[in-house]
Amino acid sequence: MSTYNPLDPSALAELKQIVGEKYVWTDREKLEPYSHDEVTGEKYVHYPEAVVLPANAAEVAEILKLANRRLIPVVPRGAGSGYACASVAYQGGFVLSTERMNQVLEIDEVNMVMVVEPGVRTADVHKLALEKGYLYPGEPSSSDSSFI
Protein backbone atom coordinates (compact mmCIF):
# COMPACT_ATOMS: atom_id res chain seq x y z
CA MET A 1 0.00 0.00 0.00
CA SER A 2 1.31 3.44 -0.91
CA THR A 3 2.01 6.06 1.68
CA TYR A 4 1.14 9.60 0.77
CA ASN A 5 2.53 12.78 2.25
CA PRO A 6 0.59 15.87 3.25
CA LEU A 7 1.00 19.12 1.39
CA ASP A 8 3.60 20.94 3.49
CA PRO A 9 4.50 24.66 3.34
CA SER A 10 7.52 24.12 1.09
CA ALA A 11 5.45 22.15 -1.44
CA LEU A 12 2.81 24.89 -1.34
CA ALA A 13 5.51 27.46 -2.04
CA GLU A 14 6.72 25.41 -5.03
CA LEU A 15 3.18 25.17 -6.39
CA LYS A 16 2.83 28.95 -6.10
CA GLN A 17 6.06 29.37 -8.06
CA ILE A 18 4.67 27.19 -10.84
CA VAL A 19 1.20 28.73 -11.28
CA GLY A 20 1.36 32.00 -9.36
CA GLU A 21 0.20 32.69 -5.82
CA LYS A 22 -3.36 33.66 -6.77
CA TYR A 23 -3.90 30.24 -8.39
CA VAL A 24 -3.16 28.15 -5.30
CA TRP A 25 -6.06 28.24 -2.89
CA THR A 26 -6.03 27.04 0.70
CA ASP A 27 -8.88 29.06 2.24
CA ARG A 28 -11.63 26.74 3.44
CA GLU A 29 -14.28 28.90 1.79
CA LYS A 30 -12.60 28.50 -1.62
CA LEU A 31 -12.00 24.78 -1.03
CA GLU A 32 -15.65 24.00 -0.26
CA PRO A 33 -16.89 23.65 -3.87
CA TYR A 34 -13.98 21.27 -4.51
CA SER A 35 -14.78 19.07 -1.49
CA HIS A 36 -17.57 17.25 -3.36
CA ASP A 37 -19.08 16.75 -6.78
CA GLU A 38 -22.81 16.54 -7.55
CA VAL A 39 -23.29 13.69 -5.07
CA THR A 40 -24.76 15.02 -1.86
CA GLY A 41 -24.31 13.77 1.66
CA GLU A 42 -21.80 14.50 4.39
CA LYS A 43 -19.99 11.18 3.96
CA TYR A 44 -19.01 12.20 0.41
CA VAL A 45 -17.44 15.52 1.42
CA HIS A 46 -13.63 15.56 1.70
CA TYR A 47 -11.80 18.87 1.67
CA PRO A 48 -8.57 18.97 -0.32
CA GLU A 49 -5.53 20.57 1.28
CA ALA A 50 -5.41 23.02 -1.64
CA VAL A 51 -6.78 23.71 -5.09
CA VAL A 52 -4.24 24.42 -7.84
CA LEU A 53 -5.33 26.03 -11.12
CA PRO A 54 -2.75 25.64 -13.89
CA ALA A 55 -3.04 27.62 -17.13
CA ASN A 56 -1.41 25.16 -19.54
CA ALA A 57 0.05 21.70 -20.07
CA ALA A 58 3.57 22.82 -19.11
CA GLU A 59 2.34 23.91 -15.68
CA VAL A 60 0.45 20.63 -15.28
CA ALA A 61 3.65 18.72 -16.04
CA GLU A 62 5.62 20.68 -13.43
CA ILE A 63 2.86 20.23 -10.85
CA LEU A 64 2.76 16.47 -11.42
CA LYS A 65 6.56 16.19 -11.21
CA LEU A 66 6.44 17.96 -7.84
CA ALA A 67 3.60 15.77 -6.55
CA ASN A 68 5.31 12.58 -7.73
CA ARG A 69 8.64 13.57 -6.20
CA ARG A 70 7.00 14.34 -2.85
CA LEU A 71 4.35 11.57 -2.93
CA ILE A 72 1.48 14.05 -2.63
CA PRO A 73 -1.90 12.88 -3.95
CA VAL A 74 -3.33 14.84 -6.89
CA VAL A 75 -7.00 14.77 -7.83
CA PRO A 76 -7.62 16.03 -11.37
CA ARG A 77 -10.92 17.86 -11.70
CA GLY A 78 -12.98 19.23 -14.53
CA ALA A 79 -16.18 21.01 -13.61
CA GLY A 80 -17.05 18.61 -10.78
CA SER A 81 -20.35 17.80 -12.46
CA GLY A 82 -20.07 14.03 -12.09
CA TYR A 83 -21.86 11.65 -9.75
CA ALA A 84 -19.00 9.23 -9.03
CA CYS A 85 -17.03 11.22 -6.42
CA ALA A 86 -14.02 10.83 -8.71
CA SER A 87 -12.93 14.44 -8.25
CA VAL A 88 -12.87 14.35 -4.44
CA ALA A 89 -9.63 14.27 -2.42
CA TYR A 90 -10.28 11.13 -0.38
CA GLN A 91 -6.55 10.54 0.18
CA GLY A 92 -5.76 14.18 1.01
CA GLY A 93 -3.48 16.16 -1.25
CA PHE A 94 -4.70 18.77 -3.68
CA VAL A 95 -7.19 19.19 -6.47
CA LEU A 96 -5.74 20.09 -9.86
CA SER A 97 -8.53 22.07 -11.50
CA THR A 98 -8.59 22.42 -15.28
CA GLU A 99 -10.95 25.41 -15.29
CA ARG A 100 -8.31 27.89 -16.47
CA MET A 101 -7.39 25.62 -19.37
CA ASN A 102 -10.42 26.61 -21.41
CA GLN A 103 -9.20 27.42 -24.91
CA VAL A 104 -10.11 25.93 -28.26
CA LEU A 105 -6.67 25.38 -29.78
CA GLU A 106 -7.56 24.26 -33.28
CA ILE A 107 -10.45 23.37 -35.54
CA ASP A 108 -9.25 21.31 -38.49
CA GLU A 109 -12.22 21.11 -40.85
CA VAL A 110 -10.38 18.99 -43.43
CA ASN A 111 -9.76 16.20 -40.93
CA MET A 112 -12.85 16.98 -38.80
CA VAL A 113 -10.79 17.38 -35.63
CA MET A 114 -11.17 19.90 -32.84
CA VAL A 115 -8.34 20.27 -30.33
CA VAL A 116 -9.42 21.79 -27.03
CA GLU A 117 -7.99 22.19 -23.56
CA PRO A 118 -9.61 20.12 -20.79
CA GLY A 119 -11.47 23.07 -19.25
CA VAL A 120 -13.62 23.81 -22.30
CA ARG A 121 -17.33 23.35 -21.57
CA THR A 122 -18.93 20.45 -23.41
CA ALA A 123 -21.73 22.75 -24.61
CA ASP A 124 -19.14 25.02 -26.25
CA VAL A 125 -17.62 22.08 -28.14
CA HIS A 126 -21.09 21.08 -29.30
CA LYS A 127 -21.91 24.65 -30.40
CA LEU A 128 -18.63 25.07 -32.30
CA ALA A 129 -19.14 21.75 -34.07
CA LEU A 130 -22.67 22.76 -35.11
CA GLU A 131 -21.41 26.13 -36.39
CA LYS A 132 -19.01 24.24 -38.68
CA GLY A 133 -21.76 21.88 -39.86
CA TYR A 134 -20.70 18.93 -37.72
CA LEU A 135 -22.24 17.05 -34.84
CA TYR A 136 -20.54 16.41 -31.53
CA PRO A 137 -22.47 13.32 -30.40
CA GLY A 138 -21.18 13.20 -26.82
CA GLU A 139 -23.85 15.54 -25.47
CA PRO A 140 -24.54 14.71 -21.81
CA SER A 141 -27.38 16.36 -19.94
CA SER A 142 -24.73 18.26 -17.97
CA SER A 143 -23.18 19.82 -21.09
CA ASP A 144 -23.72 23.37 -19.83
CA SER A 145 -21.77 22.63 -16.66
CA SER A 146 -19.38 19.82 -17.63
CA PHE A 147 -15.93 20.17 -19.13
CA ILE A 148 -14.78 18.14 -22.07
Predicted regions and their residues:
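N-terminal flexible segment immediately upstream of the FAD-binding catalytic core
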Residues: 1-65, 69, 81-112, 141-148
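Phosphate/diphosphate-binding loops
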Residues: 123, 127-129
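Conserved PLP cofactor-binding pocket of PLP-dependent enzymes
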Residues: 77
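Short beta-strands and strand-coil junctions in structured, solvent-facing domains, enriched
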Residues: 61, 122-123
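Extended, alpha-helix-rich binding/interface surfaces that flank or overlap catalytic cores
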Residues: 119
